[in-house]
Amino acid sequence: GWASKIGQTLGKMAKVGLQELIQPK
């Protein structure tokens, strides 16, 4: 459903954001 889709999107964004914080380019 739409809820799980939003959850996956937020999870991806959080993951990418965390990687950027750990290893800034």
From Swiss-Prot:
Record GO cellular component, one term: extracellular region
Localization (cell): Secreted
Tissues and organs where the protein is expressed, per its UniProt entry: Expressed by the skin glands.
Keyword flag Secreted: yes
GO biological process: defense response
Primary localization: secreted
Superkingdom in the source lineage: Eukaryota
UniProt keyword terms in alphabetical order: Amphibian defense peptide, Antimicrobial, Secreted
Sequence similarity: Belongs to the gastrin/cholecystokinin family. Magainin subfamily.
Role: Antimicrobial peptide.
Protein's UniProt name: Xenoposin precursor fragment R2
Source organism (scientific name): Xenopus ruwenzoriensis
